[in-house]
Amino acid sequence: MEPRFLLMADVAEQLNVSASQVYHMVRSGELPAIKIGGRGQWRIERSKLEEYIERKYAETAEWVRTNPLVEKDDPDLS
C-alpha cells in the first residue's frame, strides 16, 4: 500500500520540478498541504496531488481550446 502523504521532495520528483517550486505552490495555496511535527514539515496528501494534476490538465485543455495554434506560431508546421 502506498503512503497517504508525500514529502515535498517526492512531489517535486513526480512533477519534475524543484522542491522550492513545490514549496511555492503550497505557500500560495495552489497545492493543499499540511504542516506536521515539531519542525513543521510539510506533507501533501496523495489524493490532493492527483486533484492538482487533474486541475492542471483541465486548465491546459481550456487554454488550448481558447488559444488555437496558428501555423505561423509553430515553425514545425511551416
Describe the function of each predicted region.
Residues 1-16, 20-24, 46-78:
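Basic Lys/Arg-rich amphipathic helical interaction modules
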Residues 15-42:
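Major-groove DNA-recognition helix of helix-turn-helix-type DNA-binding domains
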